[in-house]
Amino acid sequence: MKVHKGDTVLVISGKDKGAKGKVLQAYPDRNRVLVEGVNRIKKHTAISTTQRGARSGGIVTQEAPIHVSNVMVVDSDGKPTRIGYRVDEETGKRVRISKRNGKDI
């Protein structure tokens, strides 16, 4: 998967189209990413009491994962781009590059 944790992405389809956010978590086995402030859902949690007597629960708003095909990585220029790879000559490792301008990400 070409999108990693910490990347800034732009949502290109769905109800949050046009929103930018940071990837909080990536799920490569499911091809999904958790983006900050995108795909917010309301989750109903059971009311529980802690040892100090505080009660928690009710309706909680949180982010839900979104499919990786619905986001594009934003490059250093602030524009969405596709991702490619090149092999670094010194280390021999793959480095992600922007297809739009050819710079490293």
Curated annotation (Swiss-Prot):
Cellular component per GO, a single term: ribonucleoprotein complex
InterPro entries reported in the protein's UniProt record: KOW (IPR005824), Rib_uL2_dom2 (IPR014722), Ribosomal_uL24 (IPR003256), Ribosomal_uL24_CS (IPR005825), Ribosomal_uL24_KOW (IPR041988), Translation_prot_SH3-like_sf (IPR008991)
An annotated GO BP: translation
UniProt entry keywords in alphabetical sequence: Ribonucleoprotein, Ribosomal protein, RNA-binding, rRNA-binding
UniProt GO MF annotations: rRNA binding; structural constituent of ribosome
Pfam families documented for this protein: KOW, ribosomal_L24
PANTHER family for this protein: MITOCHONDRIAL RIBOSOMAL PROTEIN L24 (PTHR12903)
Function noted in UniProt: One of two assembly initiator proteins, it binds directly to the 5'-end of the 23S rRNA, where it nucleates assembly of the 50S subunit.
Entry's family note: Belongs to the universal ribosomal protein uL24 family.
Assembly and binders: Part of the 50S ribosomal subunit.
UniProt protein name: Large ribosomal subunit protein uL24
Organism, scientific name: Mycobacterium tuberculosis (strain ATCC 25177 / H37Ra)
Upper classification of the organism: Bacteria, Bacillati, Actinomycetota, Actinomycetes, Mycobacteriales
